[in-house]
Design a protein with these regions (language model features):
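A structural signal for multi-pass alpha-helical bundles of membrane permease subunits
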Residues: 19-317
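Short, Lys/Arg-rich, polar N-terminal cytosolic tail immediately upstream
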Residues: 1-19
Length: 317
């Protein structure tokens, strides 16, 4: 073969690799810039603010704010709204953990039940699916407005009026403004709103399960309960694990639901609400940033423990 042809092919390959690399960088760069501008830089800047005294007095010259070390973190830990004060006042940290795990567990369980129901053949399945999906697609502001009207302790409240007419209760109850009860109601409302996400994910996996597994189990004399625990659940365990992980992260950082329902009062103040209050009510941006970093660290600890447990269970198989 001619040496010139070999050199030409080598040069052509180099040009092709160069063009491919340039195309790859051209495609990656816009996304990388967006991620840097909207995720990485704000996160790093937030950590920087948490170690400085930043408020309205120096907001225009924030990069010259005085360094205070871990003082903002100490103030957060000593704050009445953050600390566990007893069973009557859990504090924002404990409330966040209870709210996140309870709402995530309940929404995942409801999603599993709904998916099992929709996986069965019956008339009106499309209508049932649309009804189940409604809480997830409806605007949060509209949902909060309707539920506040339903749970209103005044005579105009639908639920109180109904319960009074049925003689189930003697006096009206303030479902969203009673310490203890309000947190339970918010957890139930959160589970109702977000169970369709789990339902869709679980249903898609259920429809991919091989029917021959159930047919073989039927031949062996297995009943419905045995099929569920020995076939369905093992097939769903990874999907349920992924759903629980995602919903836990989202619920742990949830702000709008609780803020619209209770404003963070009556024992429902979570860390995201506390961050908002420090930053935009007290204008103590350093303490607000420190609270958000603490929230992130708590979430990371739970995620590391959860993922390590999952990896151990996978390794045993």
């Amino acid at each position: 073969m001619d040496l010139g042809m070999v050199n030409a092919k080598g040069i052509s390959r180099k040009h092709h690799k160069t063009n491919t690399a340039r195309l790859a960088w051209a495609l990656i760069t816009p996304t990388a810039l967006i991620v840097f501008g909207l995720v990485i830089f704000p996160a790093v800047f937030n950590i920087w603010v948490s170690f400085h005294n930043v408020g309205l007095h120096n907001l225009n010259d924030v990069f010259h704010a005085p360094f205070v070390g871990v003082q903002n973190y100490q103030r957060v830990f000593k704050d009445f709204s953050f600390e566990f004060q007893g069973w009557d006042n859990w504090g924002a940290a404990v409330t966040t953990v209870v709210y996140a795990f309870s709402a995530t567990t309940l929404s995942t369980t409801l999603g599993l039940i709904a998916a099992l129901l929709l996986n069965q053949p019956f008339k009106g399945k499309g209508v049932a699916r649309a009804i189940f999906l409604f809480p997830y697609v409806a605007p949060m502001v509209s949902i909060a407005f309707v539920w506040r009207w339903i749970l209103d302790p005044r005579p105009s409240g639908v639920l109180n009026d109904l319960l009074l007419r049925l003689n189930i209760i003697d006096t009206s109850h303030a479902f969203l403004s009673t310490r203890g009860l309000s947190l339970i109601v918010v957890i139930l409302l959160d589970a109702w709103r977000y169970f369709p996400f789990a339902m869709l994910m679980i249903l898609s996996r259920l429809q991919a399960v091989d029917d021959t597994l159930y047919e073989a189990a039927t031949v062996d004399g297995a009943n419905s309960v045995q099929k569920f625990f020995f076939i369905t659940l093992p097939e769903l365990r990874y999907v349920i694990g992924a759903i629980f992980l995602l919903r836990l992260m989202w619920t742990f950082n949830k702000f709008d639901d609780i803020f619209l329902y209770t404003g963070g009062g009556f024992g429902t103040k979570v860390l995201s609400i506390l961050t908002y209050e420090f930053s935009f009510r007290l204008y103590d941006f350093g303490r607000g940033a420190a609270t958000s970093v603490i929230q992130l660290l708590i979430l990371v600890v739970f995620l590391v423990v959860y993922i390590s447990l999952v990896m151990k269970s996978v390794g045993k198989e």
